[in-house]
Amino acid sequence: GRLTAAAAAKYGLKCIIVTVDDYDGELSGNLLLDGLFGARVIVKKNDGRDKDTQLTETVKRVMEQELQKGERIYFIPMGGSDVTGMLGYYDCAKELDAQAQEHQINGATVYTAVGSMGTYLGLYCGLKAIHSSLKLTGIAIMPLDKDKLHHYFLQAKEAYGFTFDDSDMHIETGYIRKGYNEPDKQVRHAICMMARHEGLLLDPCYTGKMFAGVLDMIKEKKIKLGSQLILLHTGGMPGLYTPAHRVKFEKELADTVTVIE
């Protein structure tokens, strides 16, 4: 939502972000940035039902209210995951393939986090469309709905006339941990490892969990030593400052600060 809010601010558009969650009144992480960009954030209290159902109902209600005010609406689904949103990573796949060829990284496997599936599907279709030698593996960071993914692919196939099928999609589902945006100690370790060895910041929800999954796959010998890997960084750094994540990092990193007189 925050990047949508930023784009809306740049082009003078009104932005409303709808989410289902528990809100403690603290603006931090993405919520703080949403506010800075001038977006209106509507938080639906989680009533225990399926979150997708609650979100759909709330979005419908908010849109009806805005239409009654005379507003014109352009709806963007969670993660921008529709046949338009996936085009960003469709183009990314072509750019990535060109860079791989330039650096003679042929036949490498690209790893990406998989949430609302737009990133994965865009990459998959882009690589398939240009007959890239790069392979693609997704690391699910939340329960994967395979039927939904297949339906999403069929929508894209119809919209853009793809001639290939989705029979060789590969998404690992064994590294979800506790669920969406619920990293464990192994994920935090993976984030620290990347930061301390490469100076790159991963996030607790997507890229950190993806990298932790890759490390587990290496330990389990699903990935052989010497294999060529490309880890796709999809952003998300503000998530490090979400209270629930920050507090755990602070406890684990407390000994990195020394006070002297």
Q: What are the residue ranges of the model-derived segments?
A:
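Small/polar-residue-rich loop-to-helix segments that shape phosphate-bearing ligand pockets
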Residues: 20-103, 170-190
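Active-site-proximal loop->helix
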Residues: 2-46, 146-156
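Alpha-helix C-terminal capping segments
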Residues: 2-14, 124-130, 213-222
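Structural motif
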Residues: 74, 109-110, 228
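Short glycine/serine/threonine-rich phosphate/pyrophosphate-binding segments
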Residues: 1-5, 10, 27, 116-123, ...
